Amino acid sequence: MIDKGIFLIKVFVCLIGVLASCYVTGAFLSCWLKLKDRFGRSLLFGFVFQISLFECVALPFMLRKGSFSAMITCYLAVFCFVLVLSFVMLLLLKKRGIYQSSLVCIREELQERRQKKWFGVTFFGAAFLVLVLGHIAGVTLHQITMGDDVYYVSLATYAIDHNSLETNTMFISSGILSLPDIRPNISAWEYYVACLSVVFHLHPAQMFHFVLPLFLIPFSYLSYYYVIKKLFDKKYHMAYMMWFVILNLFFSFSAKLNSYNMFNCPWMGKVVLYNILMPCFLAVCIDIMKAEKETLKYWICVVFLMIAGICTTVVGVYMIPIYYAVIGITYAVTIRSMKEFKKLIVPVLVTVIPAVIGLLLVLQTEAGQRILEYSKTEPKRWTAVFLNYWGIDAKPVLGVAGLVLFFVSCVVIFRKENRITKTVLCGLTIFCALTIVNPLFIGPVSSYLTGADLYWRMFILVPVVYVLPYLPAKLCFKAGTLHHYEIVIGFMLVVSVGGTLLGGGAFSDKKIFAPYETTYGIPEKCVQVTDYIMKKEKNSDHEPVVLYPPALRQGLRQYTTKLTTMMSRMYYQGDYETPYGTMREVCRGVFKKQYTEEQAYQVLKGLNVDYVVTRRYVKFRNPQYFTKCKRYGRFVIYHVN
């Protein structure tokens, strides 16, 4: 077992290393682009720069199926050069008085607030920080291994175990099912995490499940704060963020809503895209809207964000440009002169080039060839999608209450806020919602290509998270002067939080609050069983084939890809045809005792299975067929003779 003290030291070193490198590169980027160095923005932009740089370095290796070691060696060489250059340049600029560290700015701002005795800001800020820490603690301490981890975490594990950049979904998930790939993968996010694992000597499963949330969750709130600062008066910022994190945590318990993934799997690339990169993207676009001249620096940031979006998930190839288009269309409607509109056309076309190149590369992959077929899939009715997202179909009264609150908030924003804020919060909401009516957009994401409509659900709800905290934040500063309609709105907010935002029923799921059994984020028995088989077969040239029960199978390939499994996730492989029926039927026969012992032996032997792990109520007694090896709790390991 792992020494927890050593593990925590590694985690601490990893956090310091990641945050320091992000800050140094981000501060230099801000200085180079003539942006004022702010600590939070420097961290975010440094992170964006790192993953966009990694995508540029990794993509040629991925397309040629090169070696993982060569890829990370190349990246680390380039990145170390950039990091050292950034650090040296910052020291030189500081010596000349050109650069001022954001830490100095933070100290000055704290002194200013102390002099003003701005109790509201400090109170809401403290509440916000406590809630964020609670969010981080909840994610890092609770145990949940999602089905998607079987692929995403295993991809990083496989790269390290086999020094390979193989991305075939079926093969990575099991090691045996070499079926046509269903994911046109040109995104390097999992390899970026694998690179961090190698550098800081941590297992990829530990990096994904335990370490990444420690800085990705703060990055998420920083990116939203970056947007809020540009939309509202300074005194509302902390109150807004306090309510935002409260609503965000409530959102997390409904699988129908965007923030569910920020609680259950913040390490996934698609969650990084929607909760970190998209808010940053919106903030930069707001800067462009407000800037009358010298906008080149912001367009450069757009290019970095475009590449970073492609790095996190392949759907970034089309979701970021669509989000870009929605923001652009929303702003174009409010533009008062054609001259201002024409100034934007060329920069927009130039900055979208990385996404165009990415889309062309996707179409050249084997899985990408199926996009046209999948896009012909009949999409879901937009009315069904809309009603489902708001929970109106399950809880009509509460769902309608939440929807009314949302629209009333939009009306108040439209009446009381400035042009840019109206454009972003009201216009963006409308145009995002309208995209689901367009079958050209909803078709591909309602199909098998990207896993139902998950990505579109997240996309449509992006503006919602900005609108809902608006009224509560305003009400915090209007105590004693409330109008009747504001009291009603506050009541509706309570109803919405109590009902719609908890509509997924996740509070009844005990797994959500179960503590981690291991630092890998997978069941302890899975680690013990796998270690036993690996130790027993360490001198064998043959890679063992195993069959695990449902409770353990999802953790196996995350922990090691040096074992082959007949089944890792039913969703991927349940319908796979074998000489003995589908894999679903085989598993049912073995684990639900629908086979006799002799039949189970013949099937497993025919599938070349070396070990089968069962629950203790499934017993194989005939030593001619099975040899009992070891028992761990309620799981028993049998060798197939």
Where are these regions (language model features)?
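Active-site lumenal/periplasmic loops and adjacent helix-entry segments of GT-C-fold
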Residues: 131-251, 255-267, 272, 276
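Short periplasmic/luminal acceptor-recognition loop of GT-C membrane glycosyltransferases, typified by
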Residues: 523-585, 603-620
